[in-house]
Regions:
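Residue-level signature for tetratricopeptide repeat
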Residues: 1, 27, 67-70, 103-104, ...
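Amphipathic helix-loop-helix modules that constitute alpha-helical solenoid scaffolds
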Residues: 1-85
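"A position-specific structural signal for the A-helix of alpha-solenoid helical repeats
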Residues: 2, 59, 63, 99, ...
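Alpha-helical junction/boundary sensor with strong preference for TPR arrays
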Residues: 48, 84, 91, 123-124, ...
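Start-of-helix register in tetratricopeptide repeats
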Residues: 59, 95-96, 129, 166
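TPR/TPR-like (Sel1-like) alpha-helical repeat modules
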Residues: 144-162, 172
Length: 177
């Protein structure tokens, strides 16, 4: 929780709109919380022993990789994708698979991530994050019309006003080129 909370001040702009992780001002992250979170994670992993990490430890390891990357470009996406693969093994579920698909897209390219996402369509059809992730990958692949539709669906399903505004803004940006 410390690793996630450390980024809290950078998640919203002054108007209350979402700021994506890649666009957050990392200077606003709480380094003391990140350091404490890393130390607790390392101690927990030592106690568990090699190859015996549980779902919370794996989620914390993923959060630590995000929190310790100096820049968004420095994020170790292959390692994050591998950790999501392990998390899917010990705590399977469609949301874990959605996150794994995003990590794979970042590590290996949007086509690979979209293939994994599309396999989840029946399971996550009613989830805005599924449509948002799919829209982003479609846009990165140049499939603009499909991306616009997917961003629209994500906005319809969004559960908070900041998410809805963000998704509508992204849809307009993609549509405008």
């Amino acid at each position: 929780m410390l690793l996630h909370d450390a980024r809290r001040r950078a998640r919203l702009d002054d108007d209350g709109d979402l700021i994506l992780l890649a666009d957050q001002d990392r200077r606003r992250w709480d380094r003391a919380q990140i350091d404490e979170g890393e130390a607790l994670l390392e101690a927990s992993l030592r106690r568990a022993g090699p190859g015996r990490a549980g779902p919370y430890q794996l989620q914390a390891a993923i959060a630590a990789l995000h929190a310790t990357a100096a820049t968004a470009a420095d994020t170790d996406w292959p390692q994050i994708a591998a950790l999501y693969g392990e998390l899917a093994r010990v705590a399977p579920g469609p949301v874990v698979e959605l996150n794994r698909a995003v990590a794979v897209a970042m590590a290996d390219g949007p086509a690979q991530g979209l293939e994994l996402l599309d396999a989840l369509a029946g399971t996550l059809e009613g989830q805005h994050l599924f449509h948002a992730a799919r829209a982003d990958l479609l846009a990165r692949l140049g499939r603009i019309d499909e991306a616009v539709v997917a961003f629209g669906r994500a906005a319809e399903l969004a559960t908070t006003a900041p998410e809805r505004r963000f998704l509508e803004r992204r849809r307009a940006e993609v549509r405008a080129g």
